[in-house]
Amino acid sequence: APGSASRDMYLDKDGNPLLNLSQNGHLASGVPGTVAGLFASHKYGKLGFAALIQPAIELAEKGFVITAAEARSLNGSKSAFEKYNTIRPAFVKKNAWKAGDTLVQKDLAATLSRIRDNGMKGFYEGETAKLITEEMKRGGGKISLEDLKNYTAAKRDPIIFDYKGHTVIGMPMPSSGGLLMQQMMKMIEDRDIASMGFHSSASVQLMIEVERRAYADRAEFMGDKDFVKVPMKTLSSDIYLKERMNDFIPGKATP
């Protein structure tokens, strides 16, 4: 999150959540981490970074022919692109997109070229950082030049668990995905879902109730371990997860 972010930035004056602010627009944006993550993982590779990124630069520069599905997606998102950007992005054009059109992304090509030539500094400092923060200021976002310059990628151990003899590997905190997956899979592990029938009311209800419990835990306990204490061992323990399902009644919604 940006350094100036606060715990109530997505709340109204009465303390009620303003969901749109956390999901769309400049205020919803966290400091971009993909570039730092790519450079952190690159040390395990063999090819030079410039060679790896060059095909993407050329594709963005020359463009590619879009499919009918891609045209529908771009057209369907046009209003959102126009609403949440102060400068029209490459994904928006005057007339509707159609299959066979070429999507050219000159700004992306320029951004990737700066990364190719200057490494991480080509993104987190200099021209790209300036462009990002200027857009943030125009749109009411919080990402600053200092946020970008100070960004680092953190290496964390993945979540690993067993499910019916299979080893499952998931994302660690601050992503909740890995722990949520572990909770949900463990809560249904001793149940014969196949016998319920695909997409039957019984199987759908079971999955809904399992997800409700996991996401309730997500809202209550999960977050960035650098800032909050997440009771990982408890949330993933067989005893705890069995207790979470004690009030599950087939055919009835849990209050």
What spans do the regions from the language model cover?
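Internal maturation/activation junctions in enzymes
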Residues: 190-255
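Noncatalytic scaffold domains of N-terminal-nucleophile
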Residues: 1-125, 129-172, 176, 236, ...
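Hydrophobic (often cysteine-bearing) scaffold residues that line and stabilize catalytic clefts
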Residues: 34, 177, 203, 207
